[in-house]
């Protein structure tokens, strides 16, 4: 029996997986370049300025110049710092958001020259659990970065981050339980397929609100950027970082913004399922994600920063009760709908 066709199939399948992983890593690493340009442009126009204009047409090459500047800066390590943890922290902050995208589907399949290619790396039946388990590791990078620097500002920033992420990951996790109950699955593909006719935002507006606000806090974006508040902490947990290590933290922040936007689209807005206007599913998905990324940027230049006590109160006194009430109401309604 000739086994070569089977071996060739395995080689092609393995090569395709390697290509997908390499493409995903390249996109996520380069993502901050256009996003920083977009953020500065949006800020400029909201403040009746032009934004970056010097480097390239309308400042398009400004992110490249900023990247070169970061790469050529001195990689400074404070004399009293814990050198091992100081070097490890940026990697721990950057790696988890990248790993999470292994479980993120961007569509069903596309046909390339007669070959069906899936737009996901893995269809996990517990994908949601995997996402929350891995993203929780990111907090260790922030804590180690603040502690290892041996700086008061950095330590305070890392402690704030730890408290903030614990306070908001709980309601964030509770917010998706209603979605899981509707789809009867923790697979992100199954959740999108369950929204073919009606998006979950119709059934889960409270869950969406809780997840969106908690996502803002998880991404440490204004109005929840207490961990790196410039006014009272310098730059927070990465005050002592410079050069490529500082760039790691910046890339991590933008990747988390993208991740939260992708999860919002998949969980509540039908993923790649469109309405009214016929468009390719992948284009629908990208447009929805782009809308939420823009919303994150818009919030930064619209809302003031909350005080620390207000931040904690919103998480424990508002979002947590809302998310628990949403679970109870969803369960009651599903039970009533299933009753004869």
UniProtKB/Swiss-Prot annotation:
MF term (GO), any:
quinone binding
The reply to whether RNA-binding figures as a keyword in the UniProt entry is: no
Question: Where does this protein have coiled-coil stretches?
Answer: none
State the Pfam families in the record.
NADHdh
Topology with respect to the bilayer: Multi-pass membrane protein
Q: Where in the cell is it found?
A: Cell inner membrane
- Catalyzed reactions: a quinone + NADH + 5 H(+)(in) = a quinol + NAD(+) + 4 H(+)(out)
Top EC category: translocase
Could you tell me the Gene Ontology terms of the biological process aspect for this record? aerobic respiration
Query: Which positions, given as ranges, span the membrane?
Result: 10-30, 84-104, 126-146, 172-192, 198-218, 255-275, 279-299, 318-338
**Please, which domain of life does this record's source organism belong to?**
Bacteria
Keywords carried by this UniProt record:
Cell inner membrane, Cell membrane, Membrane, NAD, Quinone, Translocase, Transmembrane, Transmembrane helix, Ubiquinone
EC numbers, comma separated: 7.1.1.-
Please give the GO cellular component terms listed in this UniProt entry: plasma membrane
Q: Which InterPro entries match?
A: NADH_UbQ_OxRdtase_su1/FPO (IPR001694), NADH_UbQ_OxRdtase_su1_CS (IPR018086)
State the family named in the UniProt similarity comment for this chain: Belongs to the complex I subunit 1 family.
Quaternary structure (record)? NDH-1 is composed of 14 different subunits. Subunits NuoA, H, J, K, L, M, N constitute the membrane sector of the complex.
Which function does this protein serve?
NDH-1 shuttles electrons from NADH, via FMN and iron-sulfur (Fe-S) centers, to quinones in the respiratory chain. The immediate electron acceptor for the enzyme in this species is believed to be ubiquinone. Couples the redox reaction to proton translocation (for every two electrons transferred, four hydrogen ions are translocated across the cytoplasmic membrane), and thus conserves the redox energy in a proton gradient. This subunit may bind ubiquinone.
Protein name per Swiss-Prot or TrEMBL: NADH-quinone oxidoreductase subunit H 2
Please give the organism: Rhizobium etli (strain ATCC 51251 / DSM 11541 / JCM 21823 / NBRC 15573 / CFN 42)
| Upper classification of the organism | Bacteria, Pseudomonadati, Pseudomonadota, Alphaproteobacteria, Hyphomicrobiales
Whichever gene encodes this chain, its name is: nuoH2
